[in-house]
Amino acid sequence: MKQLIRRLSRVADSTQYSLLRSESQRGRTKKEKHKSWVPEGHVPVYVGHEMERFVVNAELLNHPVFVALLKQSAQEYGYEQQGVLRIPCHVLVFERILESLRLGLADRVT
């Protein structure tokens, strides 16, 4: 899992990486972006120092890569953090992780 995160970090830092937009930004108007509505079966998470909001499928939280990210979150922010779920990860790396999970690539790398 750590190996996958390291590999994705290197890819995110490369100049060939094209920026992926978060699911919360795809195909939505400005008015819709500010809503706090979350579809059933999904969880909002805030990523990185920028606190960029992502809406991810709750089933992903059990994936080993996400478990590793959640452990990092617990180490950095503690288990008693209130309010939002924060992930201490660069936004570009997180977007790359989501894309890899979506394409089914994360299982092959771990």
From Swiss-Prot:
Compartmental location: Cytoplasm
Tissue expression as described in the entry: Highly expressed in the steles of roots and hypocotyls.
Keywords assigned by UniProt, alphabetized: Auxin signaling pathway, Cytoplasm, Developmental protein, Growth regulation
Highest taxon, organism lineage: Eukaryota
Biological process, per Gene Ontology: auxin-activated signaling pathway
One GO cellular component term: cytoplasm
Function statement: Plays a role in the regulation of cell expansion, root meristem patterning and auxin transport.
PANTHER family: AUXIN-INDUCED PROTEIN-LIKE-RELATED, AUXIN-RESPONSIVE PROTEIN SAUR71
Family: Belongs to the ARG7 family.
Protein name (record): Auxin-responsive protein SAUR71
Organism: Arabidopsis thaliana
